[in-house]
Curated annotation (Swiss-Prot):
Topological relation to the membrane, as annotated: Multi-pass membrane protein
Protein's name according to its UniProt entry: Large-conductance mechanosensitive channel
Function: Channel that opens in response to stretch forces in the membrane lipid bilayer. May participate in the regulation of osmotic pressure changes within the cell.
PANTHER family: LARGE-CONDUCTANCE MECHANOSENSITIVE CHANNEL (PTHR30266:SF2), MECHANOSENSITIVE CHANNEL MSCL (PTHR30266)
Keyword list, A-Z: Cell inner membrane, Cell membrane, Ion channel, Ion transport, Membrane, Transmembrane, Transmembrane helix, Transport
Transmembrane domains' residue ranges: 16-36, 40-60, 88-108
Gene3D superfamilies, alphabetized: Large-conductance mechanosensitive channel, MscL, domain 1
Chief localization: membrane
Gene source species: Chlorobium chlorochromatii (strain CaD3)
Short name of any one Pfam family annotated for the protein: MscL
SUPFAM superfamilies assigned: Gated mechanosensitive channel
Subunit details: Homopentamer.
InterPro entries in alphabetical order: Mechanosensitive_channel_CS, MS_channel, MSC/AndL, MscL_channel
């Protein structure tokens, strides 16, 4: 029974719950970014380049057994049993990764900026525990009546 109790304590800790929420939101954000890249960013980019659909870019490594090359589409090549290198799908993934990494960078940067402003507001200088000897300029404890360096009397 103690194992269940330990697991319950572990599972309801704030950090574990926060991490679970972060993973769920991150997965949803990843799906949004992938859709943004494949449906919004790459089609106009492909149009600018010359009417290229990135998701259908491929290289035939081996022709299919049922139909010889050329194939009109990736789906046709796959249906014919051709072995293909689908570099267009890889490019989609690279673009998604770059956008996701940039979004995470902006998030971390803004959090760090908030931490810096919070830290500067709460940073109150600690009261000094030393004073300076007026004769030799060495650091002396506040309660000292004589300087340990030059033995001068302090006021």
């Amino acid at each position: 029974m103690s194992v269940m109790k330990e697991f319950k304590e572990f599972a309801v800790k704030g950090n574990v719950v926060d991490m679970a929420v972060g993973i769920i939101i991150g997965g949803a954000f990843g799906a949004i970014v992938n859709n943004l890249v494949s449906q919004v960013i790459l089609p106009p980019l492909g149009l600018l380049i010359g009417g290229v659909d990135f998701s259908s870019l491929y290289i035939i490594l081996k022709e299919g057994a049922t139909q010889a090359a050329p194939y009109n589409s990736l789906a046709e090549a796959t249906a014919a049993g051709a072995v293909t290198l689908n570099y267009g799908v890889f490019l989609n993934s690279v673009f998604s990764f770059v956008i996701m990494a940039f979004a995470v960078f902006l998030l971390v940067k803004s959090i760090n900026m908030l931490r810096r402003t919070e830290g500067s507001k709460s940073a109150v200088p600690a009261p000094s525990t030393t004073k300076e000897c007026p004769y030799c300029l060495s650091s002396v404890p506040l309660k000292a009546t004589r300087c340990p360096q030059c033995t001068s009397e302090l006021k």
